[in-house]
Structures are given as C-alpha cells and as structure tokens.
C-alpha cells in the first residue's frame, strides 16, 4: 500500500510541529535542576503500588520502567513528558483532519499546541500532567471517530484510553462525565442503544478497578488529600478570575483561536459533544470556586483544532483571505515571546529580567508566597544544597547516634531530595508525614535522635528533651518557605515515634 499520501497529507504538518516541540524541550531540559515533584516521584517509583495518596499508579510505573532502562538523569527523566507533549501536538493535527480542516488549519492548530505556556510547563518535568493532556486529547479524537463510524473498534480504543487515563489521573472522570452528558443532550444519544459506549465504560472501569481496591484497602487517602488541598491549599477563584487566568495560562495569543473553536464545536451537530465536554468541565471547576485554573488546560486540543478549521473555512472566501496571515501573525508575534515563560530556556538571572521586561508574573495558584521566580521554576532550586547541609549535621553525630538517627522532613520535596541526593553524602533514607511518605511509616525510627528538616522554628521544642537549631537552608531562587528553613537536631522524643505517627499525618 502506498503510504505517501498519509505522510504528505494528514501527518506531515503535525509531525513537523511535534518535532519543533521536542526541540524546544531539548534546549531546556538541563537548564535548571530537578523539580520538587520529580524527586518525590522517584521515591514513589522505588515503592511500586496500585496507588499513592496523591495519584494513581500509571505514571509512577512508567517512571520505574524508565529508571531501569535509562536511569534518572534530567534528560532520562524528562524525555517521556516531552514525548507525551509531542504526541498531543500530533493528535491536535489529527483532530483538525477529523473536523474537516486542511493543511493551514493543521499548521495553525499545531502551532497553538506548541506555544501553550502551561503545556510547555507540564511537558518539561516528569509528572502525570503531561500524560493527562495526551490522554484527554486522544480520548477526544477517539470519541469523535466512535460517534462518526459507529464501529466497535473506536469504542474499544476509547475505553482503553479512558481506563489508562484514569490510572494516570482521576480527573479523566470529568472527561467521561462530560462525554456522557454530551451524548445525552445531542442526537448522538441513539448510540446508547448500541454496545459501543457500554463496552467502553466497562473497559475503563475494569482497568481502573485495581486502584479503587487500593483506595478501599488504605482508607480512601486520596479523598482526604483532595479535601485538604481544596480547603487549605488552593486559592479561591471567582468566575472572572478563572477565565482571566485561562486566557493567561493558555496565552492571550491563542484566545481567539480556542474561543472560535468552542463556538464552532457547540454549533456543530456532529462534534457538539466535544464542546459540551469542555463547557461541563469548565462549569464544574468554576462552581467549585477553589480549583486550580490549570485543571482545564487538558481540554483545549479539540478547541484549537475546531478553531483553526473554522478560520481556514472563513478564509476560503477571498474577502476574508486576510484571516490566514493575521491569525498566524497574532499567534507567532504574541505567542513566541511567551515561550521562555513556560520553559526555562534562559539562565535564571536573565529570566528574572525578561519576565520583568514583558510584565509577566503568574498569579499564585496555591496559598504560598512567591519569590523572584514562579513556583514552577523556583521548585527546581536548592535541593542538593539541602541534602548537603543535612549531611553535615548527620556526620557531626557520634557513630552510636548516627546508627539510630532518623531524618524527618516536613514535606515530600525535602524528603525526596534527601532520598535522591542523600546517598552521595552518606545519608539514610528520609521519613516524612507528608502524603505517601506517611504511608511508608517511620521505618523503625524511635525518635531518640532525629534531624528534623523544615517546619516552623518553634515546632519541635515541646516534644523533645533537647532541641538544637543546627543549620538553616540557603537558596536564593527557591520558594521563600524553603529558604531559611530550619534544620533541627532533636533528642529524646517524649513518646515513641510510631505512636505519634497517626497524629502528624498530613495529606495535601
């Protein structure tokens, strides 16, 4: 069979833009250091399970396999999210074709997918979020094909993608709920009389079932995690602020494209379901009042595709031919200068100056103070120095105390840093009360001798016979609460640590 029409037609432009996306990430991959969450995920990957306090197991399982094959250098760690991001660009191009668009529409939509600042952020570091965008985009393409073709094949594919997506991040439930609502509210409801949708739902449920069993066995820790994060960590966001942040996170340059795309989807009898998915998820997030605005970022690929196809159709009229160059100019002239906001392409001092020059400073999405860098970059600084400082305290102890000394970290970033960088400085594994570290327990430490990292300066004094402030962290570009964090040397916990463990649990 001659494959040239496929490569020269439907895939040529998306593949080119996907390659550009990969090139951008390759330029930035080692510019700064390991991100806080990456260090934690590496610790999780050493302890495989069917679930974790703050996420399902799929991305951690992928990381475990990846570490076995290629190690855990920055390049080894980050090629997978970059590939997932490139896959999202490719799927966006295929969505354009499925919606009737041609090469210009593919070029415009895929260019949008490359330049989205928040997608650049999540595709730079290893996390479930890069795969989440990929699964949402692929699910949208398969849903459209399933509704168009009426065959079982696309429905089976959709079920598998939904199931894997759920094993990656439970927010895939929003897609499933939005798709079900869209089918019920449109003429596509007739497909509910066929096997396809029910088979897809069954497959997704079966794939997700082991994680549900894990949740039951562990007392539904993720529900506690979500409740605490919503109440104590997320910033309250109103309707206007939510949509203002959508425009900012997705880039003002891309706003006209996705707005046209949303209108085009809702006006389309054939693809209205995809528009309803977006609207229903957005409505849910706005109604919650405290969700992070970037949660909706996973749902934009169909909007870019539909918007680009609509602009291409409108520009087919000679009187509106100007739409093509104007659309490309807006996307490029405004979108390109924002790339260093999403990717650490610049040395840190130049980034600080550049962000001040263009007036970009992201609004905090959590209840924390920002430093000179936004949190997505600040959390890449200070971790090895933290381990080095803890090691100095640890090795200052007599051998008898070192043998029973535990290192208790206030949060999973600090604990992950001790676990990752600690072996080169002769440190034992860390323990922590934060998220999945709490499930791993105190590991036999009694509290007789503890090095406590982080927290408030008055935290441990009432619990120990002796408390010494041994050192403090010092990192210019890290998050302010990590700079100057105390490192305590504590002796004589007033009760066994195993007994205190339940009291100090913190899921958020």
Model regions and ranges:
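Signature aromatic-anchored transmembrane alpha helix within multi-pass, membrane-resident enzymes
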Residues: 313-355
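Membrane-interface alpha helices of multi-pass inner-membrane proteins
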Residues: 47, 110, 142, 154-169, ...
């Amino acid at each position: 069979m001659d494959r040239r029409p496929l490569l020269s037609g439907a895939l040529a432009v998306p593949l080119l833009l996907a390659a550009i996306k990969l090139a951008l990430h390759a330029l930035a991959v080692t510019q700064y250091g390991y991100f806080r969450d990456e260090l934690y995920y590496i610790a999780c990957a050493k302890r495989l399970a069917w679930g974790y306090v703050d996420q399902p197991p799929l991305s951690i399982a992928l990381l475990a396999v990846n570490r076995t094959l290629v190690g855990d250098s920055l390049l080894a760690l980050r090629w997978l999210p970059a590939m997932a991001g490139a896959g999202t660009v490719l799927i966006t191009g295929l969505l354009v074709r499925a919606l009737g668009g041609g090469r210009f529409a593919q070029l415009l939509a895929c260019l949008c997918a490359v330049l989205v600042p928040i997608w650049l952020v999540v595709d730079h570091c290893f996390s479930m979020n890069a795969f989440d965008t990929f699964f949402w985009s692929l699910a949208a393409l398969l849903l459209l094909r399933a509704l168009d073709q009426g065959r079982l094949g696309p429905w089976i594919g959709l079920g598998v993608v939904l199931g894997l997506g759920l094993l990656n991040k439970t927010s895939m439930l929003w897609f499933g709920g939005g798709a079900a609502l869209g089918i019920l509210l449109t003429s596509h409801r007739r497909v509910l009389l066929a096997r396809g949708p029910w088979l897809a739902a069954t497959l997704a449920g079966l794939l997700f079932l082991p994680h549900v069993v894990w949740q039951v066995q562990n007392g539904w820790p993720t529900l506690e995690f979500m409740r605490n994060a919503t109440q104590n960590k997320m910033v309250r966001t109103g309707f206007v602020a939510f949509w203002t942040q959508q425009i900012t996170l997705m880039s003002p340059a891309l706003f006209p494209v996705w707005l046209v795309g949303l209108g085009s989807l809702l006006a389309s009898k054939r693809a209205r379901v995809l528009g309803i998915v977006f609207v229903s998820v957005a409505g849910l997030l706005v109604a919650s009042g405290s969700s992070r605005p970037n949660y909706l970022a996973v749902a934009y690929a169909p909007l870019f595709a539909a918007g680009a196809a609509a602009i291409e159709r409108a520009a087919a009229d000679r009187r509106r031919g100007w739409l093509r160059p104007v659309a490309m100019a807006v996307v490029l002239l405004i979108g390109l200068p924002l790339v260093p906001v999403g990717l650490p392409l610049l040395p840190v001092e130049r980034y600080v100056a550049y962000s001040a020059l263009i007036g970009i400073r992201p609004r905090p999405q959590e209840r924390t103070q920002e430093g000179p860098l936004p949190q997505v970059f600040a959390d890449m600084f200070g971790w090895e120095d933290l381990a080095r400082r803890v090691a100095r305290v640890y090795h200052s102890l007599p051998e008898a105390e070192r043998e029973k000394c535990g290192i208790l970290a206030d949060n999973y970033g600090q604990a992950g840093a001790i676990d990752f960088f600690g072996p080169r400085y002769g440190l034992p594994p860390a323990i922590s009360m934060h998220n999945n570290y709490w499930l791993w327990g105190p590991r036999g430490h009694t509290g007789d001798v503890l090095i406590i990292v982080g927290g408030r300066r008055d935290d441990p004094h009432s619990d120990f016979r002796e408390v010494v402030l041994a050192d403090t962290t010092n990192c210019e570009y890290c998050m302010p609460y990590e700079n100057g964090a105390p490192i305590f040397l504590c002796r004589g916990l007033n009760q066994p640590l195993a007994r205190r463990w339940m009291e100090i649990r913190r899921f958020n």
